């Protein structure tokens, strides 16, 4: 086996999320067996038994590989609670390897057999043990799962504390790690459904519920508020005085996400408590008797969703998403929660499905028939998206009267009550669409922006239920009124709605967001949020030609050299990078004088700008026009040479990559680069740089040597290098070059005189090797 392949396998094993010690032991043996496997195949006898023996070894290796992959790809929480099962798998993999290796040892030459015996001996002495701390975490999570159905609001903090401690021990302490864990849990659920393992699915579904419930807490405690806007849904503009309000609203939302098992305090004594929305079927609006999960991940009463499908619908009634299949999976987790809630509130557990679907089924059916993708603001009231407050029909009049009384007694807090997630998305849309007071609309949109910041599911649901169009209408009115604060609020709400959601980005494009942004960038006060939204949209492939052919390109380029906010300038630079990855945009970018602007940024010496500027230049250099303009731009070669001297590893890698592209096929560019005295830097990078940097620097040095050999007269081919050994910096220069051409090189030597002595020993070593 190739050494690089072994290293790759070792790296994969060391990437284990949990049970790292066991993975390390098994991976070491796995790689040793892989290294001799080609020899085993060559030495195999042609008998049927010999082939079967090798096949058994191959199967044993595959088992070992699968358990290693399982530990590196699976959910940390699931690995923790299944520690004993994982340990058993390691023991089985070990036994299978020992048995198959012993059988192989009998049919191969003694030289290979001795290696096999050594591996078998190592395996026999290997003892797999669970890490005590990981086992403790697993036990705590199992205890939490067993008690999960008994928690009420009073002990919610206990559940939070236990889960938070367990997650922290598993290093789930940031927005990114929480997102990775949720995705891993979803994959486990998908596998459980394929395997039809209902118990496993129910357990993992509850773990996913806990992760979703507390992800906001982990993010608020641990995440860096300055994360890149393309990687996390945080706004690139600071929130300042609104920070306390944002945190308060986040705490409020986390309460809404919890299942409330206690009777609602707002109910009058003697009245029946209202079941939490999570326990009611969105179609029947009643407690579920036989809850099932459909392809969208939503839970419904079985008879209700079966009727929905039998009537010819192939979409989710709640989210309106088209479903890839119509299969149903029992949701035992929700069924257990329903039983627990009924027990604590003195209510009889449902003994059968609802007898009638009443009116709400037909409302949902009408909503589904009106639009398969999204709904207008006027028709939103016909659907029941995720966070709408739904109650049994017999209680609806009581709820309505309570709401009217609250509006009379607490008019100043009208908007705050409207944004309450339990009041529903339709109410929010109604305010954004019909409220005449811009200040109230602005407050609602701001609160929704905060909700969208950390809630991926809310982005999906809101995007599918008319919020893109509503926010664009709000932004259009803000632009028309020249209200900079409202423009920022609207743009950043759209920004958060578009994060990691290409469907919402496409809706914005087709709904006319670009003309609005072009108006915003004409006003200095709204350029920041407009640039941020441009950046988000530029991540979409379909948006790159649209933005690339608009006024945005020249605006971004001009912004690079203006004295504006750092974040705004960074957003513009990142947007230009995204646009430059679409090759038809390059002529437009070049015509906007982008290369000179990037050269100025890269020459500032500020590492904040250098790396991304060079990344854009690399994309531009991939075209013939871009390459030619870079070579002829005054100061460009000098700037790249300076980065080779003073840049960090990544910057040096990018700079040398640029120079390789520019010098390939261009003798004049090679002369310009050599006159900058780059040889010591290139030699240093070829020894100490990143793998790609080393490779590129060696290629560039090779280009220089080839050019020098082409320029040297053949009779002097052997003498020329010896004459120049005492002058390391002059070695790459063409020996036959006129004296006038050598002078700039001498000047370059003096400019970097301090660099000559430290790198001279490297150059001499390189000279002795290459010449």
UniProtKB/Swiss-Prot annotation:
EC number of this enzyme: 2.3.2.27
Residue numbers spanned by region Disordered: 394-415, 706-751
GO MF annotation terms: ubiquitin-protein transferase activity
Top EC class of this enzyme: transferase
Domain (U-box) ranges: 274-348
Record key words, sorted: Repeat, Transferase, Ubl conjugation pathway
Family annotation (SUPFAM superfamilies): ARM repeat, RING/U-box
Pathway: Protein modification; protein ubiquitination
GO CC annotation terms, alphabetical: chloroplast
Pfam family, one: Arm_2
Source superkingdom: Eukaryota
Catalytic activity: S-ubiquitinyl-[E2 ubiquitin-conjugating enzyme]-L-cysteine + [acceptor protein]-L-lysine = [E2 ubiquitin-conjugating enzyme]-L-cysteine + N(6)-ubiquitinyl-[acceptor protein]-L-lysine
Biological processes per GO annotation: protein ubiquitination
ARM repeat residues: 456-499, 502-542, 544-581, 583-622, 625-664
SMART domains per the UniProt record, alphabetical: ARM, Ubox
Gene3D superfamilies, alphabetized: Leucine-rich Repeat Variant, Zinc/RING finger domain, C3HC4 (zinc finger)
Residue stretches of biased makeup (Basic and acidic residues): 400-411, 706-722
Main function: Functions as an E3 ubiquitin ligase.
Protein name: U-box domain-containing protein 6
Organism this protein belongs to: Arabidopsis thaliana
Lineage, top ranks: Eukaryota, Viridiplantae, Streptophyta, Embryophyta, Tracheophyta
